[in-house]
C-alpha cells in the first residue's frame, strides 16, 4: 500500500484489542487509510457506521478490524448455540465473499476467532461442515445464507455485529428482500454493531441504513474526481471493423503486467478471449457462464500472475481486490455511468498508478456524453494510424466449455507497431 494513500493516524493509536493490532502489524498495516481513520473511532465507541469511499481505499479492513475488536471486547450472549454465529458479513457476489474471507484469515489466525464462508454455486456440503463445527464470523451471499437459515443450519439470534458490504450493488442485483429477511432473524439494531459500506450512499442506501441500523453515523471519503487522479484515462474512436485489431495492437504496445478487459456481454468477452488466446496471450475469461470452481481458479491464477489478462463482464467490476492491476481496457463503453468508474477503479488502487483505455466504437460511443458528465471531465482522446494496426493475426479460438481458461503467452519481444497522435 502506497504511503501517499495513508494518513498519519496509526492503528496502534486506537484502543484496539492487542491481538488485532498484532495481526495488523504482522501484515505490515501500521497507518490508516482515510476511511479507516474516520470509521474506527466511531465503531470502537460502539456507534453504527454507514461509510462511503472509492473502491480500493481500505473499506474491507475498516469493517474487519471493527468486527474482530468488537467480538474480542464483548462476551457472546448467554446460552449461545453452536449454530449461532456472532457476526455476519453480507456481500453481493461470491467472489467478494471469498476475498473478504481471505482478508479476514490473518486476523482469525491471530485471535482464534473462527470463520465461516457461505456462497452459492458449489461447495454446499463443504461449507456446511465448517458451519456445523461452529463459527464466530460468517461471511456470505444472501441466497446461500437464507438457504442455511431455513434448514436451521445457522441461527441468527446471537448476532452481535452485522456488516453489509457494497450495499448499492445489493440493490442493483435485487437482493434487498433477502437482506431484510436476514435482518428480521437477528436481534434488534440497538443490540448489534452495524456497519454498511458502499461506493455510493444513494437515497435508497441511506433509507436502508435508517431502517436497519441504530442512528448510523455517515462517513464519506470523496476523491477529487470520481475516477481517481492516479488513473491515466485515454479514449480511442475505432470503427467496428478496426476495433479488435486496435485492442490487440494496444496490448502489444502497452504489454501490461496485469490487465482487465471489460465488455458489455458474455458473448463479446468470449470473442475477445478467443482472439487473445489464439495470439498466445496468457488470458482468462470471467463471465457468469463460467463454473464457480473455475471462476475462483481463474481469479487465483490472475492474482498470482499466472495469467496476464482477464476478460470480464461487469460481474467482476465490483468488489474484487486484485492487487497491482496496471491496465483496464473498456472494449465496450458501459451503458451505466457508474460501471465506468467501477471498472477503471480496478487499477490505480491504494495509491498506485494505473492506465485506463476505452474504445468508443460506433455501437457504444453514444454512452460517452453521459459518462463524461457523470465523472465531471472529458476523457483525453488519442488517435491511431489504421495502417499501423496488427493484421497478421491468427484465427480466433472458439470457446470450449470444458476449458475456458488460458493459452501460453508467446515468447519474445512484443511487436513494435506504434500509434499516431
UniProtKB/Swiss-Prot annotation:
Query: Motif (DEAD box) spans which residues?
Result: 165-168
Name all Helicase ATP-binding domain ranges.
40-219
Q: Which stretches of sequence are listed as region Disordered?
A: 396-421
Keywords on this record? ATP-binding, Cytoplasm, Helicase, Hydrolase, Nucleotide-binding, RNA-binding
Report the EC code(s) recorded for this entry. Answer: 3.6.4.13
Name any one GO molecular function: RNA helicase activity
Question: Where does it sit, as one GO cellular component term?
Answer: cytosol
Single Gene Ontology BP annotation = RNA catabolic process
Tell me which residues bind ATP: 53-60
Group of enzyme by EC: hydrolase
* Residue span, Helicase C-terminal domain: 245-390
Q: Where in the cell is it found?
A: Cytoplasm
Keyword RNA-binding assigned: yes
Enumerate the Pfam families for this protein.
Answer: DEAD, Helicase_C
Q: Where is this motif: Q motif?
A: 9-37
Catalysed conversion reaction? ATP + H2O = ADP + phosphate + H(+)
Q: Which HAMAP family match?
A: DEAD_helicase_RhlB
- Oligomer status and interactors: Component of the RNA degradosome, which is a multiprotein complex involved in RNA processing and mRNA degradation.
- Protein name (Swiss-Prot/TrEMBL): ATP-dependent RNA helicase RhlB
Amino acid at each position: 500500500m502506497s504511503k501517499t494513500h495513508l494518513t498519519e493516524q496509526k492503528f496502534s493509536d486506537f484502543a484496539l484489542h492487542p491481538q488485532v493490532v498484532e495481526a495488523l502489524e504482522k501484515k505490515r498495516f501500521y497507518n490508516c487509510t482515510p476511511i479507516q481513520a474516520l470509521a474506527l473511532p466511531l465503531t470502537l465507541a460502539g456507534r453504527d457506521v454507514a461509510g462511503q469511499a472509492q473502491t480500493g481505499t481500505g473499506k474491507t479492513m475498516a469493517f474487519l478490524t471493527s468486527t474482530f475488536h468488537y467480538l474480542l471486547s464483548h462476551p457472546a450472549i448467554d446460552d449461545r448455540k453452536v449454530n449461532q454465529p456472532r457476526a455476519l458479513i453480507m456481500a453481493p457476489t461470491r467472489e467478494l465473499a471469498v476475498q473478504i474471507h481471505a482478508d479476514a484469515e490473518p486476523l482469525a489466525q491471530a485471535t482464534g476467532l473462527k470463520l465461516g464462508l457461505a456462497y452459492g454455486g458449489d461447495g454446499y456440503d463443504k461449507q456446511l461442515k465448517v458451519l456445523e463445527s461452529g463459527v464466530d464470523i460468517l461471511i456470505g451471499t444472501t441466497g446461500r445464507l437464507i438457504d442455511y437459515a431455513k434448514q436451521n443450519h445457522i441461527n441468527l439470534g446471537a448476532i452481535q455485529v452485522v456488516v453489509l458490504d457494497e450495499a448499492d450493488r445489493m440493490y442493483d442485483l435485487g437482493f434487498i428482500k433477502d437482506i431484510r429477511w436476514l435482518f428480521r432473524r437477528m436481534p434488534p439494531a440497538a443490540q448489534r454493531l452495524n456497519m454498511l459500506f458502499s461506493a455510493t450512499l444513494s437515497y435508497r442506501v441511506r433509507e436502508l441504513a435508517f431502517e436497519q441500523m441504530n442512528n448510523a453515523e455517515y462517513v464519506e471519503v470523496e476523491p477529487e474526481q470520481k475516477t481517481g487522479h492516479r488513473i491515466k484515462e485515454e479514449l480511442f474512436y475505432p470503427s467496428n471493423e478496426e476495433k479488435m485489431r486496435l485492442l490487440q495492437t494496444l496490448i502489444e504496445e502497452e504489454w501490461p503486467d496485469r490487465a482487465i478487459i471489460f465488455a458489455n456481454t458474455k458473448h463479446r468477452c468470449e470473442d475477445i478471449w478467443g482472439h487473445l488466446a489464439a495470439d498466445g496471450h496468457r488470458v482468462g475469461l470471467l463471465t457468469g457462464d463460467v463454473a464457480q470452481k473455475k471462476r475462483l481458479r481463474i481469479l487465483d491464477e490472475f492474482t498470482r500472475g499466472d495469467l496476464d489478462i482477464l476478460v470480464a463482464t461487469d460481474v467482476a467490476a465490483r468488489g474484487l481486490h486484485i492487487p497491482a492491476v496496471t491496465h483496464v481496457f473498456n472494449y465496450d463503453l458501459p451503458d451505466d455511468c457508474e460501471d465506468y468508474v467501477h471498472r477503471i477503479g480496478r487499477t490505480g488502487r491504494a495509491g498506485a498508478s494505473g492506465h485506463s483505455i476505452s474504445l468508443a466504437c460506433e455501437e457504444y460511443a453514444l454512452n460517452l456524453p453521459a459518462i463524461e458528465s457523470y465523472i465531471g471531465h472529458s476523457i483525453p482522446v488519442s488517435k491511431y494510424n489504421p495502417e499501423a494496426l496488427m493484421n497478421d493475426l491468427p484465427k480466433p479460438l472458439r470457446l470450449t466449455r470444458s476449458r475456458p481458461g488460458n493459452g501460453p503467452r508467446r515468447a519474445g519481444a512484443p511487436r513494435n507497431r506504434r500509434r499516431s497522435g
